[in-house]
Structure formats: C-alpha cells, structure tokens
C-alpha cells in the first residue's frame, strides 16, 4: 500500500472512530464523501474498502437511530483496524477489514446496495472531474 494512501486511511479511521465514540453519526456522511473522493483519486482496493465501510456504518447507524433498534458495537473492530494499519501490518489489516464488512453484511442485508452506491458516487465524481478538466 502506498504510504500516502495508508496515512490518508489512518486519518479517515481516526475521524470515524471519534464520530462513533461520540455518537455523531451525522458526521459519517462527510467522512464518507471524503473517502469516496479518495477512492476516486487513488483507485485502489484499500481506499474503496474504507469508503464502503464508512458509508455502510453511516447507513446502519442512521437506521438504528430512526428505528430505535440495537446497533452492533463495531468500535473494537474499528480500533483494531486503526492499530493494524498504524503498525503497517497490511495483510492483517485487510483480513480485519473483510471481517468487519462481513459483520455489517450479516447485520444489514442491504450491504450489497451500499457497495453499489459507493461505486456509483465514485464514478460520478470521476466523470465530473474529467468533464471539469476537459
């Protein structure tokens, strides 16, 4: 993983963890938009996975708040992701990322839809940038 991408993902994870701890779920939208922007620029799997993660967390948290349902506590897994990437243990980080995405998928059957929405937003952002620059 490129060092610039790694540092950027660490910033995103840190912001996500803080928002999660303070239950500022509305912040996930802005964080998600930033990660989608990064996924568009870097076009790598790691940036895309983080974009999907943050977007899905925002959707799940919003639904839990609206319905009064119980949300899964993913904070320990988010902290583990952050720690693994901070230590540059990339293979373990990627395995942990797959696990947390699987856990969200098990909790929310709409996960496949979130992936498609992130990909669509990234395509739109890329298309608008191409149009902007001629």
Spans of features found by a protein language model:
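DNA-contacting interfaces and partner/effector-binding or oligomerization modules
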Residues: 1-72
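Amphipathic alpha-helical repeat scaffolds
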Residues: 14-17, 82, 128
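Charged low-complexity stretches with an acidic bias
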Residues: 62-90
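Short, charge-rich, low-complexity alpha-helical interaction segments
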Residues: 83-105
């Amino acid at each position: 993983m490129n060092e610039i991408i790694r540092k950027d993902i660490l910033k995103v994870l840190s912001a996500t963890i803080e928002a999660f701890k303070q239950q500022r779920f509305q912040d996930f939208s802005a964080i998600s938009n930033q990660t989608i922007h990064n996924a568009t620029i870097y076009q790598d799997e790691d940036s895309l996975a983080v974009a999907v993660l943050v977007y899905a967390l925002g959707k799940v948290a919003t639904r839990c708040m609206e319905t009064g349902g119980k949300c899964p506590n993913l904070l320990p897994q988010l902290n583990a992701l952050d720690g693994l990437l901070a230590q540059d243990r990339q293979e373990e980080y990627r395995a942990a990322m797959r696990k947390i995405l699987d856990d969200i998928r098990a909790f929310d059957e709409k996960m496949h839809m979130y992936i498609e929405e992130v990909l669509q937003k990234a395509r739109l952002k890329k298309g608008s940038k191409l149009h902007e620059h001629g």
